C-alpha cells in the first residue's frame, strides 16, 4: 500500500474504516512525516507534528474520562497508572500496527531507507496525529467512537490489567500473612454473546473475601481480588 499514490491509499483507508474526513487534507497531514515535507518543498505540505501535539492531549482526555467512568473504585493514583500504560509508546505502536498505519505514512527517501516506516516512535506519533486530525475534523464524539472500536475494548478485555494486578497483590498479601489458600470461581455468566458479563468470587480457605464483575473472566477476577485486598487490609488495620 505504501507505494501507491497518496490520495489513493487514503481514500481506501477511509472506505475500510468507515471514517470519512470532511477535510481530507487533515487526514493526509496526520500521516505526513517531516522528512517528506523536507524533500517536497515545492509542494504545499505540512508535517504532522502540530497534530501530534493536539492528539496527545485529546487522547489523554478521552482515555481519562473513560477510565473515570468505567472504574469508579480506582483511586486517583491507580487511574493515573492505568492511563499511562494505555497512552505510552508501546501501546500506541500496537494500536497503530493493528490499523496498518505504517503503510499510510508519507516519508522522505532517507527516512524510508533507514526503516522509519516501522520505527516505534514514528508510529506512536502518527497515532496521536491521527487522533488530533479526527478531533479537528469531526469533534470529540468522533474520537470517542473511534477509540470505542480500537482501544476501549482492549481495556475491557483486561489487556492492561497487569498494571493494576490485584490478583498478584492479593496472593503476596496472603503468602506474607500465612493465611492459607486462595480460590477463584466464576459464579455467573450473563448477557448476550457480544456483551457478556462475568461474576467472579475469590475465597480464602473456603471463606468468601470478594466478588467482582467484569466484561471478561480476567477482569471479574481482578475486581474480586481488589475487593478482597481492601477487606484484608481493613481487617489488618483493625
Curated annotation (Swiss-Prot):
Residues 10-139 form the RNase III domain. This is Ribonuclease 3. Keywords: Cytoplasm, Endonuclease, Hydrolase, Magnesium, Metal-binding, mRNA processing, Nuclease, RNA-binding, rRNA processing, rRNA-binding, tRNA processing. The keyword Ribonucleoprotein does not apply. GO terms for molecular function: double-stranded RNA binding; metal ion binding; ribonuclease III activity; rRNA binding. Its cofactor is Mg(2+). Residues 165-234 form the DRBM domain. Mg(2+) binds at residues 52, 125, 128. It is an enzyme of class 3 (hydrolase).
